[in-house]
């Protein structure tokens, strides 16, 4: 067994990174392990992807992270406690999406420290340009990667520079590339990887 404490799941866009992590989390929860962290599910309207939300894996709190037509307070969070959003030209854009970095700040500032302190496994879906618009996300993700709690993170396949490249080049990471002929077996492989690294609390 390697000494790596961070598993990076990577592959091309729409290769199944999020699905693999969701199925892995389900297996760990069924085993009675505590899992925390962040996920970034896509949002679709009339079959069209219109943006991404950000979700606290442990609490279920959900907020709007990015939208094609910009983000606004009206989008809000599912619990009605969303902070005022940036919007319009002042908000960062990634491709066609406008990103609300303040929402990522808020959820990353709660979900990731809580997961590091209290969970058996930290999930980060994903480490990608939208999330990196939040300095708080970068700080908390870095802290999670540096500590001993196992981390499962999705990361873009072609990332080689900056923070993304630095994460991929960490000596304490093990990379899992999604292959079409092994996709169905990957969640159990990842779950076993985590189980072997969970330390008694």
Regions picked out by a protein language model, each given a short descriptive name:
Residues 35-37, 123, 175-177:
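Conserved beta-strand scaffold positions in the cores of enzyme catalytic domains, especially
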Residues 12:
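P-loop (Walker A) phosphate-binding loop of NTP-binding proteins
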Residues 80-125, 129-136, 142:
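Phosphate-binding/switch loop-helix module in NTP-utilizing enzymes
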Residues 16:
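Conserved glycine(s) of the Walker
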Residues 19, 26-92:
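N-terminal phosphate/diphosphate-binding loop that engages ATP/GTP or pyrophosphate donors
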Residues 1-4:
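Phosphate-binding P-loop
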Residues 9:
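Hydrophobic anchor at the beta1->P-loop junction of P-loop NTPases
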């Amino acid at each position: 067994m390697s000494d790596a404490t961070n598993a990076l799941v990577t592959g091309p866009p729409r290769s199944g990174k999020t699905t693999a992590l969701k199925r892995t989390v389900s297996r760990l929860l069924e085993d009675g392990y505590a899992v925390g962290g962040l996920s970034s599910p896509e949002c679709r309207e009339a079959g069209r992807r219109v943006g991404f939300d950000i979700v606290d894996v442990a609490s279920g709190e959900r907020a709007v992270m990015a939208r094609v037509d910009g983000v606004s307070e009206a989008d809000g969070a599912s619990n009605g406690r969303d902070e005022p959003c940036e919007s319009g030209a002042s908000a960062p854009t990634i491709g066609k999406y406008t990103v609300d970095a303040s929402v990522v700040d808020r959820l990353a500032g709660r979900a990731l420290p809580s997961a590091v302190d209290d969970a058996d496994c930290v999930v980060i879906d994903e480490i990608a340009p939208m999330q990196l618009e939040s300095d708080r996300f970068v700080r908390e993700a870095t802290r999670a990667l540096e500590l001993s709690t196992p981390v499962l993170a999705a990361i873009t396949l072609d990332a080689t520079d900056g923070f993304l490249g630095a994460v991929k080049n960490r000596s304490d990471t093990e990379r899992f590339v999604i292959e079409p002929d092994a996709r169905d077996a990957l969640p159990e492989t990842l779950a076993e990887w985590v189980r072997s690294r969970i330390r008694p609390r």
